């Protein structure tokens, strides 16, 4: 089952009463033995009590699969044999994670908001600790991101949320 998080960011500092109404063409995606990919269409509108602010709105959409703990191993050659030499337990890594934005990610969300809402792919992965003898524990989380990104399971889709008339938006996300 996928969970959906939608962050709505306005590029103005004025406080307004706004809400977001969203819909998806699929509420659930069944992963079965015959699953060969799917596409999720997300659409919505910004409901306002006042006229739209000046300036462009920014929208960030995240779609995440269930998080699960995983063990990440580092292989090294020991006496001519490749073997697992280090292991780090990653507490929670989503099985699928996609971030779609209405413009460039760095101009859509700042570091404080990213830290607070855990929007970016590295922040969506929770790795609390590692054995004391592993000095580069962050590289294990990086390996999870690298491997799952190569498989299409982690996606950063910049400029993929279309906004019409500062009110309607839509995006489409491919699941491998």
How should each PLM-predicted stretch be described?
Residues 46-49, 175:
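Short solvent-exposed capping/turn motifs at the termini of beta-strands
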Residues 2-13:
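Sec-dependent N-terminal signal peptides
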Residues 50-55:
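A short beta-turn/strand-edge loop motif at beta-sheet boundaries
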Residues 75-175:
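Membrane-proximal low-complexity regions enriched in glycine and acidic/polar residues
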Residues 60-62:
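Beta-strand signatures of extracellular beta-sandwich domains
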Residues 65-74:
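Short aromatic-acidic-glycine turn motif
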